């Protein structure tokens, strides 16, 4: 797990306060499903995922993306205990859903890309470094249940 400096925490929290969770969440999950199509197998119940436009316009993708980012927002308040914060989600994704833990890393990287697109020049290399540290730590926390 990454150690977060006070500067990291301030940088992450500051940008998070400006994130539109619904838009960024839907775009992040949508892009994951388009760029890494093998991840679609976990979302059979979401209906039409046959093309990029179908995925990006799918209301279930948008809703789940918002749910994912809402969960991430809660974790931002507990950066020093991400493993504890994500213990139940790790168990669910490992034991019940059998999600490949590599997918958490991919999703984090897609989120960083989406934030860069949304925030442009405000998403400086320093901001990116703090966010990359955070999504890496979250992916590690979500993978903690895996053996």
UniProtKB/Swiss-Prot annotation:
Phosphoserine: residues carrying this PTM: 45, 51, 53, 140
GO function terms (MF aspect): heme binding; hemoglobin alpha binding; metal ion binding; oxygen binding; oxygen carrier activity
Record PROSITE patterns: GLOBIN
Keywords, in A-Z order: Acetylation, Heme, Iron, Metal-binding, Oxygen transport, Phosphoprotein, S-nitrosylation, Transport
PTM annotation (S-nitrosocysteine): residues: 94
GO biological process: cellular oxidant detoxification; hydrogen peroxide catabolic process
Sites bearing N-acetylglycine, chain numbering: 2
Stretches of the chain forming a coiled coil according to its record: none
All copies of domain Globin, residue ranges: 3-147
Distribution of this protein across tissues and organs: Red blood cells.
Matches recorded under CDD domains: Hb-beta-like
Sequence positions bearing Phosphothreonine: 13
GO cellular component terms, A-Z: haptoglobin-hemoglobin complex; hemoglobin complex
Positions that bind heme b: 64, 93
Alphabetized Gene3D superfamilies for the sequence: Globins
Positions bearing N6-acetyllysine: 60, 83
Quaternary structure and interacting proteins, as annotated: Heterotetramer of two alpha chains and two gamma chains in fetal hemoglobin (Hb F).
Function of the protein: Gamma chains make up the fetal hemoglobin F, in combination with alpha chains.
Membership in a protein family: Belongs to the globin family.
Protein name according to UniProt: Hemoglobin subunit gamma-1
Organism name: Gorilla gorilla gorilla
Gene: HBG1
């Amino acid at each position: 797990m990454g150690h977060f400096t006070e500067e990291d925490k301030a940088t992450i929290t500051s940008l998070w306060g400006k994130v539109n969770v619904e838009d960024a969440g839907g775009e992040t999950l949508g892009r994951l499903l388009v760029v890494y199509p093998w991840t679609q197998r976990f979302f059979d119940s979401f209906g039409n995922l046959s093309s990029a436009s179908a995925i990006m316009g799918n209301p279930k993708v948008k809703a789940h993306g918002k749910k994912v980012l809402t969960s991430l927002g809660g974790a931002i308040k507990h950066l020093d205990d991400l493993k504890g914060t994500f213990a139940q989600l790790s168990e669910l994704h490992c034991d019940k859903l059998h999600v490949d833990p590599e997918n958490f890393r991919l999703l984090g990287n897609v989120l960083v890309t989406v934030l860069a697109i949304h925030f442009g020049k405000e998403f400086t290399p320093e901001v990116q470094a703090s966010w990359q540290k955070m999504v890496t730590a979250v992916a590690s926390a979500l993978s903690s249940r895996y053996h």
